[in-house]
């Protein structure tokens, strides 16, 4: 019970961390409003990190990490995926999905995630606009955000990539192996988060960059609960990103 209380307290601490983020609205070509938090570097900087949340949470999971990055002189931007957090509106809301049948929900889900690559690209472009032509950007994807990180890195000069409790399909692992194995890669997974852990091992074995890291945890915690159970994890992620985002 005491351990549970400590974990809950740590979660609340993370989620209530005072943030100096600028709250943004990024508008797509179709006029859809995406909400994001921009953590502006406290100094002139040509480094940035795009933070993509997991599908059972929203961009606030990165409040602490985003602020720490900014304090290190690195621009950071966390995006609420369309249909999540403050980017849920119109046909893309939890209430709308709950009203659908199982079959309808599957179709609606595929329609929703089809928008995400362009939505993430819009966020990347905004972050890139805050830097010179020599700017370098990393991307971290938690859980479902990992596949979006792969797509973004395939199509843009992303320097660093991270998979935070992000299980990948065989197809996505092949995409990583084809185009991204030379990039510094941070991989975080719990041993009993079965499919995710197996995927993480495959990605780590595939990486050819000597700076790639695999952080393994006991248990089955998935994504942001790891930030609560290990209060040093956020700082480690920030330090690793800082060390790898170099020209």
What spans do the regions from the language model cover?
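Primarily recognizes the serine-hydrolase "nucleophile elbow" in alpha/beta-hydrolase
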Residues: 122-181
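Serine-hydrolase catalytic machinery in alpha/beta-hydrolase-like enzymes
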Residues: 26-130
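Short beta-strand/loop motif that positions the catalytic acidic residue
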Residues: 180-181, 187-189
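Catalytic active-site module of serine/aspartate enzymes centered on a nucleophile-bearing elbow/loop
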Residues: 229-247
């Amino acid at each position: 019970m005491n351990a549970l209380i400590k974990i809950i307290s740590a979660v609340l601490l993370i989620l209530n961390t005072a943030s100096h983020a600028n709250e943004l609205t990024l508008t797509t070509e179709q006029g859809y409003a995406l909400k994001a938090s921009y953590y502006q570097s406290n100094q002139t900087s040509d480094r940035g990190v795009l933070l993509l949340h997991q599908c059972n949470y929203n961009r606030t999971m990165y409040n602490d990490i985003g602020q720490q990055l900014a304090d290190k002189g690195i621009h950071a931007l966390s995006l609420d995926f369309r249909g999540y957090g403050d980017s849920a509106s119109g046909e893309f809301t939890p209430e709308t999905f709950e009203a659908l049948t199982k079959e309808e929900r599957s179709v609606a889900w595929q329609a929703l995630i089809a928008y995400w690559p362009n939505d993430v690209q819009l966020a990347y472009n905004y972050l890139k606009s805050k830097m010179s032509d020599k700017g370098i950007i990393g991307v971290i994807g938690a859980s479902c955000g990992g596949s979006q990180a792969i797509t973004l890195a395939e199509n843009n000069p992303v320097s660093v990539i991270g998979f935070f409790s992000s299980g990948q399909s065989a197809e996505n692992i092949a995409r990583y192996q084809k185009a991204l194995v030379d990039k510094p890669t941070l991989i975080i997974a719990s041993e009993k988060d079965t499919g995710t852990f197996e995927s993480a091992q495959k990605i780590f074995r595939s990486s050819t960059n000597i700076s790639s890291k695999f952080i393994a945890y006991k248990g089955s915690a998935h994504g942001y609960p790891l930030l609560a159970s290990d209060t040093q994890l956020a700082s480690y992620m920030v330090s690793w990103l800082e060390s790898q985002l170099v020209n």
